Amino acid sequence: RDAGFAAFRAERAGPDLNTRVADVQRSLSSFDVILWQEKLTGRKFDPAIEIVLLQFSKPHGIKVQGQTFLQATDYDVATTVRIAAHEMLHPPVPMDGPVALAALKVLDREDLIMRIVREHDPRWGYTTLEGVLNEDLCEALDQLISEALGVARNPADRWRKQDDGMHVLAAGLYGLLR
């Protein structure tokens, strides 16, 4: 209170926060992310997605639990759709199931993939082979969803620039799934 946080927050959020929430809801109504997630994963998803708009979350969209994720208040609609397409996929398959275990067994023998796991900048996360598989499969699937919904980034640019280019597996999986 003494630091003036309430006034700072009111100034930072501005008078238009409720308007922004309504704009986001209205803008997203024409994007059926869940339809594509169900189609590509074979899983059922709840029909509702909860987006929590925050002032200080850039540059990330962050899954909290279930189908709730956090994102910056001022992200555009395309970014919001891409975040929803990605975050709700975690994990893309049961990571202790036969498909993931078989993939992990194969990937564990791949020198390039294991070098990426060991040597990439740890600030990007994904410090285990399981983490890389989980993330990169989500990225490949979210790219397909974003393309279907008309909000995709260029995949070559995305994977060359993002996280110092560590998502080689995502690019390969995307190529196989297209």
Segments predicted by a language model, with ranges:
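Auxiliary, metal-adjacent structural segments of Zn-dependent hydrolase domains
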Residues: F8-V64
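Second-shell loop/turn segments in exported
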Residues: N18-S27, Q71, R123-L129
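Soluble non-cytosolic domains of exported or imported proteins
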Residues: V24-F31, T79, I83, T128-V132, ...
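Short pre-active-site segment immediately N-terminal to the catalytic Zn-binding motif
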Residues: F69-A84
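Active-site recognition of the HExxH zinc-binding catalytic motif
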Residues: V81-V99
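Post-HEXXH active-site segment of zinc metalloproteases
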Residues: M95-R123
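Long, well-structured alpha-helical subdomains associated
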Residues: E119-R178
